[in-house]
């Protein structure tokens, strides 16, 4: 008789490279537990099917990193908020942009779809919460009350309330119909990262960076219990669908809690690090985590997890006898949510204000929607998920099969971390992954959307060179094409690269010694002139980095020499050069632009004033150079990320030049 195979309770499913740059947000579809959406610093939203290596769809249109993403309950719509404060809604079935919503003044930290009506709630770094009508492209209401960034938003199951968690250590409950705050729940001593409604009862759970989970009674508006002793900040919690327990995604573990009284039913070790989102499907809990550009998915078999009954660990009352029995989960001690009989009638009665009529101009919306695209990367998976062909419209959707659990003692290996396609310029280090998570299976290389073309700017901080050539720092020399390299030629090529780098560093050292000799005399202007005469931008950057640290070193005659070099730095492909150029230009604009404009606007004086004439000549020269740079700054102000913010700030400072 065959020995039954013992399988694992928790295991790693796969790891993929989800974006060409860092992943900044992700979310699981709660209906199926199989759809994953990721947002990245590359301004894209990518959709994935859990346990499949290929990207299904890539959504473009944002011009700054995507900070928050959320799927609606049927997994037909997705909303994404960016660092610039813009919000975009896509229809996944139609594969197109649905709405662009503008109004927040800072990055979007949290989003949620209304469970029935066509509404979206957004929370921002600007401390405001806004309720949007997707059909009317307008803000229905703005909720004010938090003093810091709003980190999480959740609609109640009946769609009447909205819970918000913020960095100001508070949880607030808002009445959508009345358009006002119902109650504030203080008690946390750190930023509140997540809130979650009980699926049936008037109960709310909140998790905080103070390592506690608090349960709130929504009838009496008071705390029910508090779970203390979490191993780290609480970032992800989820109620079981029948409401019998709460799952907390902790650092490298899953914990199962009850709340009356507070107790821990079970602890499952899962090496997922900082888990970002949880979902339940087929008695399996799916957890996803991200690090840099990698996203990892994990599975916990809930049939082998204690969810009620005997307590295995009690971090709150560990030294007290366990005499209380768990009540029947089916017997509710609180009011039950009453579902509305119609799907959209209740939310439409939301109190409106003057802001509800504010919409983006139609021409602006049309332009945004033209620039937004839904690129289907895998047509087969897309059709299977978003375009199912049921023979009869009443046929229930096909239920996903549970993931098979690997054997407990099998020397399994995880799927190989997918790597970017050859077209991708950014080389990402392969992360070490544990080898005791999933059964051995053929390694699958994933394909991710490849960015088009080389990066405009080479990052200043990186683990390895990215498209960096030492020969870029030397005069261009025509190199004849060579035939296929043999071993001797390869060694010669390696030595040639070494010689090139040696020449670069030797030249840099010599140039810096020359500038330093002049610098020690205390003549800053002559030092800068000598650096410019050397015709090596790297030396100019090193010198400006010193001058920028002490604003008092800047003089008007120094500006006339530096401004042409700043124009070159702003057009460089090296991030450090661009940063130095932006910093220097900002100092010049703040200290000298008012002086330049005042001198140029002043009427001519009577008689001959040589010093005034010299000052006027310098101001005219600086003004001409600033006008030349302003066009470059304006053209780059539409960039995303840090450079875009810096150029937009410079563009505002240079507005008086127009």
Curated annotation (Swiss-Prot):
Residues 1-300 are annotated as: Interaction with centrosomes. Residues 436-658 are annotated as: Interaction with KATNA1 and NDEL1. One of its GO terms (biological process) is cell division. Residues 285-437 are annotated as: Interaction with PAFAH1B1. It is found in: Cytoplasm; Cytoplasm, Cytoskeleton, Microtubule organizing center, Centrosome; Cytoplasm, Cytoskeleton, Spindle pole; Cytoplasm, Cytoskeleton. Residues 311-329 have a biased composition (Polar residues). This is Katanin p80 WD40 repeat-containing subunit B1. Belongs to the WD repeat KATNB1 family. Disruption phenotype: Homozygous loss of the gene is embryonic lethal. Mutant animals have dramatically reduced body size, reduced limb bud outgrowth, microphthalmia to anophthalmia and forebrain abnormalities ranging from microcephaly to holoprosencephaly. Brains of mutant mice have reduced cycling and proliferating radial neuroepithelial progenitor cells compared to wild-type, with a more profound loss of cells that depend upon asymmetrical cell divisions. These cells also show evidence of increased apoptosis. The keyword Nucleotide-binding does not apply. PROSITE patterns: WD_REPEATS_1 (PS00678), WD_REPEATS_2 (PS50082), WD_REPEATS_REGION (PS50294). Residues 352-374 have a biased composition (Basic and acidic residues).
